[in-house]
């Protein structure tokens, strides 16, 4: 299972969404982006992950705004935890890219 599939399943367990909606509203891509990537076992692009992280944090902020209901606060915290996973993936990709670029420069 790819990182993106794992994230989709986590979000879908909190608030059921279609793969088309995930592609459009969460990844900021075309309707078939996620399904196509999944079929080819490809990860989402860095750009799509940044959009995803922003959407997750937006969901968290909406749920936390003037809210004291424990269920909604808990849901907001779950969105934040997923956003941190996405941020970690973006950071790991940046590090790998930097290391790869350094090796290429040496050649």
Enumerate the language-model features and the residues they cover:
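A short, Lys/Arg-rich alpha-helix, primarily the initiator
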Residues: 1-14
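A general alpha-helix detector
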Residues: 6-7, 33, 52-55
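Short alpha-helical "recognition helix" segments of helix-turn-helix
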Residues: 22-23
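Helix-turn-helix/homeodomain-like alpha-helical modules used for DNA recognition
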Residues: 65-107
């Amino acid at each position: 299972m790819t990182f993106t599939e794992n994230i989709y399943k986590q979000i879908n367990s909190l608030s059921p969404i279609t793969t088309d909606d995930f592609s459009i509203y969460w990844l900021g891509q075309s309707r078939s982006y996620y399904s196509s990537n999944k079929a080819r076992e490809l990860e989402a692009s860095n750009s799509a992950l940044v959009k995803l992280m922003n959407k997750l944090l937006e969901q968290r902020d909406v749920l936390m705004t003037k809210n004291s209901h424990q269920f909604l606060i808990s849901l907001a915290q779950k969105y934040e935890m997923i956003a941190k996973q996405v941020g970690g993936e973006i950071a790991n990709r940046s590090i790998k890219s930097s290391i790869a670029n350094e090796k290429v420069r040496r050649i």
